[in-house]
């Protein structure tokens, strides 16, 4: 190792309190519950459909932009431009989709999609009801719920709430 360079371990050796025996056993139980076959089929379709130019009635994944603003000002990102801010569509005039509209969209796609991503351009953790939206999607049996984040708002309490939401 070069003595002049600083190295930071990825997780700094932390063992978070989310890694409990109960959670580990729940994970192991779910490993044998049969979801793996459904997930493999989802991933197979993810690759196969575009290659064979097959279009389904519903996509495998829906991106639901929950927030059209960000807490950073990265120079390459369009969210910092006035043009972007001026052209935001009606549900985003205040910077985030309202909870009722998010639920209506989830109701529309539930049972038809495998995966829901609660982000696109904006920073989803700025949405005041993100955890509630994720929980609602999980209750509607959407298998995979995800979002892309810059991580600035994440802390252990928020992370636990997200994990509990599904």
Regions found by a protein language model. Give the residues of each.
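Conserved alpha-helical substructure of the radical SAM core
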Residues: 3-165
């Amino acid at each position: 190792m070069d003595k002049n360079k600083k190295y930071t371990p990825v997780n700094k050796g932390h063992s978070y309190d989310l890694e409990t025996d109960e959670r580990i056993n729940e994970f192991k139980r779910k490993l044998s519950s049969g979801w793996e076959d459904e997930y493999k089929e989802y991933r197979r379709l993810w690759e196969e459909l575009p290659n064979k130019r097959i279009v389904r009635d519903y996509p495998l994944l829906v991106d639901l932009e929950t927030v059209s603003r960000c807490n950073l000002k990265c120079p390459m990102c369009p969210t910092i431009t006035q043009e972007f801010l001026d052209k935001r569509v009606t549900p985003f005039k205040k910077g985030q989709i309202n909870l009722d509209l998010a639920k209506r969209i989830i109701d529309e796609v539930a049972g038809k999609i495998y995966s829901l991503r609660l982000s696109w351009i904006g920073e989803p953790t700025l949405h005041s009801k993100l955890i509630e939206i994720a929980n609602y999607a999980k209750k509607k049996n959407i298998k995979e719920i995800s979002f892309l984040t810059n991580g600035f708002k994440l802390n252990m309490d928020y992370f636990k709430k997200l994990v509990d939401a599904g």
